[in-house]
């Protein structure tokens, strides 16, 4: 992408960040009356997994306003749980955590490790991870705007370890102020090369 295109994307990012901050003040109070403002596409596969009692790894990228998914998910899948990375600002972390929990979603701190997530998947729960964050040198590097970015491989690793499907869940803000949520099943894969793990290959795909 050109420098001009990257600058435009950065400007849009900060504009949407401001909108998300305003939404953060009220999302915990959302109820059925807000349903017309959220359109969900592709939930058929998720419903099928729930009927089968199949655990699902839900990959949630930081697009649109991902916080609106907290009040939405209990209606999409029974007893969902989410792994949360702590915020550096303790006051903001306490506020966001309280408002997420009001929605009825089961928030698990990152420091608790992966065992609760594995148990949740094996019992048929949906486990959400916001995993498009900098994973440092131990992450999987994927191309992003022409540069290699380090990403968490934990969603793919959990899916491979429990033989659970991965569902991509992305929220997008529409021009009329509503939100569109897209659910898409990520294809099952095997490693692209002998040097790369299945989890790394899967991370590159989503």
Predicted regions and their residues:
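Membrane-anchoring hydrophobic helices of lipid-metabolizing enzymes
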Residues: 1-60, 93-98, 104
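Acidic side chains
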Residues: 23, 67, 79, 132-134, ...
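Catalytic core of membrane glycerolipid acyltransferases/transacylases, capturing the structured
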Residues: 16, 54-111, 137-140
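A conditional alpha-helix N-cap/helix-loop micro-motif detector
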Residues: 36-40, 89, 107-110, 148-149, ...
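Generic structural "secondary-structure junction" signal
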Residues: 26-29, 40-42, 68, 89, ...
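Non-catalytic C-terminal accessory region of glycerolipid acyltransferases
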Residues: 2, 11, 51, 75, ...
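Short, hydrophobic/aromatic alpha-helical segments in well-folded domains
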Residues: 45, 69, 95, 113-116, ...
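Generic preference for hydrophobic
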Residues: 40, 82, 107, 183-185
């Amino acid at each position: 992408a050109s420098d001009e295109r990257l600058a435009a994307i950065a400007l849009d990012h900060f504009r949407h960040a401001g909108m998300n901050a305003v939404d953060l003040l009220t999302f915990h109070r959302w109820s059925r009356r807000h349903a017309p403002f959220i359109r969900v596409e592709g939930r058929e596969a998720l419903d099928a997994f729930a009927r089968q009692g199949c655990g699902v790894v839900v990959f949630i990228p930081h697009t649109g306003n991902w916080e609106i998914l907290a009040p939405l998910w209990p209606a999409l899948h029974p007893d969902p749980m989410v792994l949360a990375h702590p915020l550096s600002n303790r006051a903001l972390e306490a506020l966001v955590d309280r408002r997420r929990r009001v929605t009825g979603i089961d928030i698990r701190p990152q420091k608790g490790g992966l065992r609760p997530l594995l148990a949740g998947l094996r019992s048929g729960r949906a486990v959400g991870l916001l995993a498009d964050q900098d994973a440092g040198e131990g992450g999987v590097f994927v191309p992003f705007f022409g540069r290699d970015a380090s990403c968490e491989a934990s969603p793919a690793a959990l899916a491979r370890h429990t033989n659970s499907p991965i569902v991509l869940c992305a929220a997008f803000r529409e021009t009329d102020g509503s939100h569109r949520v897209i659910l898409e099943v990520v294809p099952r894969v095997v490693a692209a090369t002998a040097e790369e793990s299945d989890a790394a290959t899967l991370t590159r795909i989503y």
